[in-house]
Amino acid sequence: MNQGVGVLGTVRDSCKIHPMVHDYRMTEAIENLSDLITDQGNGSDFFARNHITQGMDALFREGLLRLAGLSDQAAFELAQAMGGGKTHLMVALGLLAKHPGLRPTVLPADLAERLNFGPARIAAFNGRNDPEHFIWGEIATQLGRADLIRPYWIDGPRGVDEKKWLEIIGDAPTLILLDELPPYLLN
């Protein structure tokens, strides 16, 4: 191909492959929401290899301000094409909610200084799983309140009322992430 003035090269010619692409250890990184609960790292590796997009910035701003009690926006629906983008956004938000030390290094200063809460409690549900205690039992278990939800699943599934959810969640900053719900709802 002629690489004269004004002619673009191919993607292969124009880009360099990052060495991380060939690093098989990347499979050890957080790949799904449930890893947020058990991961021992602080999330810095995740953000070192990811670029913060405008969409991520908007989600971080609104979601973290809600956790700080500075926004009334309580639910966020991520409507994106398939391919992991939604899960990626939720993992990123979960890491920032869980690890306050990341916030000053990842977030704009005007946002980070407004976040007056420590580590948020996180419940992360992946609908490709099928827990015996149903989605609400799994969420309550991750929040350390399995005892309060047990009556709603032990003798067969029953809906959990708003008052019980308020008791389970309490006043502590709490982030509940739900991913891949259609497969769960089909079961």
List where the protein language model places each region:
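Walker A/P-loop-proximal flanking segment of P-loop NTPase domains
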Residues: 2-84
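Intein modules and their embedded homing endonuclease domains
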Residues: 68-77, 95-102, 122, 136, ...
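Extended hydrophobic secondary-structure segments that form protein cores and membrane-embedded regions
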Residues: 76-84, 119-128, 175-180
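Walker A/P-loop
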Residues: 87, 133
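Hydrophobic positions on the alpha1 helix immediately C-terminal to the Walker A/P-loop
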Residues: 89, 93
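Flexible phosphate/Mg2+-sensing switch loops adjacent to catalytic phosphate-binding sites
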Residues: 94-127, 148-160
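Mid-core helix/loop region of P-loop NTP-binding domains shared across ATPases and GTPases
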Residues: 147-182
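Conserved ATPase-coupling elements of RecA-like P-loop NTPase cores
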Residues: 184-187
